[in-house]
Amino acid sequence: MDYGLKDKVVLVTGSTKGLGKAIAELIAQEEGIPVVTGRREKEVHEIMMELREKYQDERIQGYCVDFSELSSVDFIFDVIKKDLGSIDVLINNAGIWPTAYVVDMKPEDFERTIRVNLEVPYLLCQKFVQEKIAAQQKGKIVNIVSQAAFHGSTTGHAHYAASKAGLVSFSISLAREVTKYGINVNMVAPGMVRTPMTEEALKAKPDYDNGRIPIGRVAEPEEVAQAAVFLASKCADYYTGITFDATGGMLMR
């Protein structure tokens, strides 16, 4: 299947490991131009060079960005514009998953979770649609949400669930606003995915999938990445405001 991603510039936030890295790799595999981002310069450089070498494409870029800082939004758009031109697809994947039950939760932890998981994606989406509308160009946004946005959390992640629920409502509202400009906004809702972010939790509860995931196992990053790449592609031109459940049956909505 031709996804129509050849030569498309795709910003993937949080893409040095886990799901984000898997998405960036699939974009490169489709001859798109992934923009790798992460907080650690060494990791960003290593992944960028790995993808450049594997897919023989020197256009693949990587930038060290801390998306807990609001200033990161203007920075990433400016450097991409300088090096590659405009962004064709925005994939908001960067996020944090701190653990704290509400009774013990610190306000600063709640605020940081909302900032990284909701406020910065809002600002990135805003900047993206402003530029696309001004240039009269079509575009695609894929926001990575979570099954917790729909079911809440039972494992000490109420702030995470709240941030992702907010991103769901925001994404649907944005889709209603910008579809007339040829901009599609969709979501992928993973369940538990085997990534560095979830590694400790899975070690602590090795039987997590027993009885919770009908398919009987946690997801590998590549499985969820396929959903994100589909929604980023021309194959999803008729889809907007939808949530692609990639939960192994946890949602079944």
Question: Where do the model's predicted regions map?
Answer:
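Short C-terminal tail/terminal secondary-structure segment
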Residues: V229, T240-R253
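Substrate-binding pocket helix/loop in short-chain dehydrogenase/reductase
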Residues: Y101-V102, K106-I114, D209
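Residue(s) in the substrate-gating loop at a strand-loop-helix junction
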Residues: S146
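Active-site helix of classical SDR
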Residues: C125, S163, S171
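Short, small/polar-rich loop/turn modules that mediate ligand/substrate recognition or access, typified
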Residues: T179, N184, Y239-G241
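Conserved glycine-rich cofactor-binding loop
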Residues: T16-K17
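Alpha-helical segment proximal to the catalytic Tyr-Lys
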Residues: Q130, I172, R176-E177, D237
